[in-house]
Amino acid sequence: MCERQRRIYLAGDSTVQSYTKVMEPQTGWGQVFYEYFKGHDECVERQSTDSRFTQSRQYELPGVVIDNRAMAGRSSRNYRVEGRLLDIADSMKEGDYLFVQFGHNDANKAKEERYVEPEKFGESLMPYVEVCRKAKATCVLITAIAMRNCDDNPEGKFTYSFPEYREAMIAFARKENIPLLDLGKATTELCEKTGAEGCKQLFLWVEPGEYPNSKHKDGKQDNAHLKVAGARAFAGVLRGLIKAYNQDDRLDFIKAQLR
């Protein structure tokens, strides 16, 4: 019997999720993250073999498996309530990783099932840490990615998305000694360099008829979700953050898998 490969589980929202062709060009960074790993040209993609949630996708690489369990509209709260964290826990093994990116939907006061007060964000993230500790796996916290929010700000500047949640996650990671990758900061800096117009190529700005067989066939001007180019750019930023991580050796296995 073949030894099971170590896995990197992804728990998050629509900005991380893998999508089917009918949603093109919408793409989550978790859908293309595998492209930054050694042997990416040999990657086998399939539905996750041991998940009961049909949107879950596995990316089987020579040295590791990326198991994307992210789902649109989920916060750290309703992701857990729906049993999605338990779904990961049921298959997690010693040596695995769990990357956790939430914040976008936690801030949605209009939807009670999603909302988490910033002051309680750490408390809402704790079960993800506990699942990893029980399995002797490594939890990695990731701050929410940037939005194209320049149109809403004076002088067209990009600012951190959901800053109170970013700050709460950073404080929680420090308190619990959890590796943290500040993807929110790094992608905001990327957007600032790319500029307001350039970022339309990263986010889900689509002309009517551009994708006639897609759910976005009528066009879209979406400043939260990503196109393929944006997902690849943001996944590349995450790769850089992993390589630069120097707080301890907990990410060394993943560093060795990156190209």
Set out the residue ranges of the language-model regions.
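Sparse, context-dependent recognition of short Cys/His-centered cofactor- or disulfide-binding micro-motifs
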Residues: S18, S51-T54, V64, R77, ...
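Short, solvent-exposed coil/turn elements at secondary-structure transition points
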Residues: S14, A72-R74, I145, A186
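Short, acidic Gly/Pro/Ser/Thr-rich loop/turn segments
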Residues: V16-Q17, S76, A107, T188
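Acidic/histidine-rich helix-loop elements
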Residues: Y19-T27, A70-Y79, A110-V116
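Short, solvent-exposed coil/turn linker segments
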Residues: V44, R74-S75, D182
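Alpha-helical cap/lid subdomain in secreted, periplasmic
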Residues: V81-R232, G236-R259
